[in-house]
Amino acid sequence: GVIMGTPFNLQNRKMLFSNYANHIKGVGNFITGADVGLTIEDLVVMRKTNSSIVGLKGDPVRFTALGMYCSIQLCLGEIFGSEDISNRTFAIQGLGNIGIAILHLIYGRAKRIVVADIDDGQVQIAKSLFPNIEIISSTEIHKVKVDVFSPCAMGGILHDLSIQRLR
């Protein structure tokens, strides 16, 4: 589910997530994890209201990246006839938790990796961890010819114009 709204003070936030957890009781188990705007503390509040809430333990980043990696492999198999990434080129837009986790999974195995982020600090962190990556502007990365384009930024990356420019 998605909850959209303005930032809440702590008391209103607890009430919001408690009410949300109560509302979803009828759907059965609800599997979630901390994500953008959703904290472990929010999940604890939800769990107190609804015992079917799961996802409080473990690092969701690792599992998100692994799920993306498996999806990429399946797509490669479908399109190229092999899930092997060793001869494949990648573009990763966004070097936050997920982008870095994807790099950990493909670095040293992929033929070429091009990355971009609007935060120069994140770019430098990625370059120090993965010295052979190529850095490109966030406004240009979707124009680079690659086998796999992985948008790991906050959103709005793929739209009518950017999709037309994918290579």
Residues of each region from the PLM?
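ADP-ribose/adenylate-binding Rossmann-like module
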Residues: 148-158, 164-167
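Glycine/serine-rich phosphate-binding loop and adjoining beta1-alpha1 elements at the start
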Residues: 2-83
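Flexible loop/turn segments at secondary-structure boundaries
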Residues: 39-40, 99, 122-123, 156-159
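General beta-strand structural signal in soluble alpha/beta enzymes
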Residues: 30-35, 54-56, 115-117, 137, ...
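Short amphipathic alpha-helical segments and helix-helix/interface helices
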Residues: 17-21, 103, 123, 161-164
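Alpha-helix boundary recognition
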Residues: 25, 47, 107, 142, ...
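Short glycine/threonine-rich loop-to-helix capping motif typified by GTGT followed
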Residues: 5-14, 99-104, 163
